[in-house]
């Protein structure tokens, strides 16, 4: 039986051979989180699930991401443990436990790495935490709020997913983008530690999905491609306008995709 890692490699090769060179160069494998702790694998160019795996050693994952600093897949559990996930076996190994708790409700929880600082951004509602992934030390950053001059100034943001650009190695610069479910728009977190937000533009989705999962694929040369899994549909998102363009239905999943992590192209 193929392991998840082997399936990721095979899927990426197949997708690359099925499309033109320009698209093939940026085709990459994606991990999706469904249910409480199930990982699914598909490709950015062909969103058909080719492998599923339950993560062992945890009860529930609230989010996942790829950590560029050490090239591992990281998950965060509902009890604030940071775990490393072995893609060969599905086993989760605790790396650290956060020393400050994030009040969790039914609202989505944001889990994403700042590749430049090698710190984990951990947010829900308007609460904005920055976490050392090896020690669990939490810095409580500024409350999320739209900045002065933004058309949504004074409104309560509803940030449900986030991602950083240039997530490859340790870049010299990065930028953070979010999805606001109330507005249905792409938002830039202009000063991530301060929590300041600026609306970029509407996604333009026909129907409001139950879940939003967002990540940005960084490549050598500074190219960044944003992907949004809205329910069971995969889109690319223009980081300059916010407009979403349909890639295709994520086939082979039983429930909506709650989070995604784009892995380096193999």
What are these regions (language model features)?
Residues 48-56, 91-102, 140-152, 196-206, ...:
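A short beta-strand motif characteristic of beta-propeller blades
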Residues 44-47, 86-90, 132-136, 191-194, ...:
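Short loop/turn segments that connect beta-strands within beta-propeller blades
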